[in-house]
């Protein structure tokens, strides 16, 4: 694939491997991942019955010290396939549990970074507080709930308007931020 997101992910994979880090690269489209959380699966998950494909994702997450998400922002949210992935994978009993009537995150001692591409102007997003809203809801809100306390994100804006040099600079920002976390 020749997308900007894939170029970011490839560079992150490269810098990680150069530092001797094992990388589990999950391209949801390439995997033909089914993002639908069925009622039956939800009921089974609550009984501790986990589908094989989801158990594999759980295993990858448990092995990870650093989780990196690279995705475009669509209508102020995750692309539907990523939303479905998170719905199915960050399940009760794996990502969080209920204890004394309260939710407790189970994915402790993990770091997360997110690189989010947007077609619009980044300054406008910040002016309207969209970056803060994203942080509260999608980024730290969701993943802190699951126990991941160290979550950082970078927004890359105007991706349809910038030239290749600007894209390369953004890719290197992602590489540098990854290098700092390894």
What do these predicted regions represent?
Residues 1-94, 161-182:
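N-terminal beta1-alpha1-beta2 submodule of the flavodoxin-like/Rossmannoid cofactor-binding fold
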Residues 20-22, 109, 147-150:
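A generic structural signal for alpha->beta connector loops
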Residues 24-26, 68, 113-116, 151-154:
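Hydrophobic/aromatic beta-strand patches that form the interior of the parallel beta-sheet core
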Residues 30-34, 93, 104, 140, ...:
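Generic secondary-structure boundary/loop-capping signal
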Residues 97-145:
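Short, glycine-/small-residue-rich phosphate/pyrophosphate-handling segment
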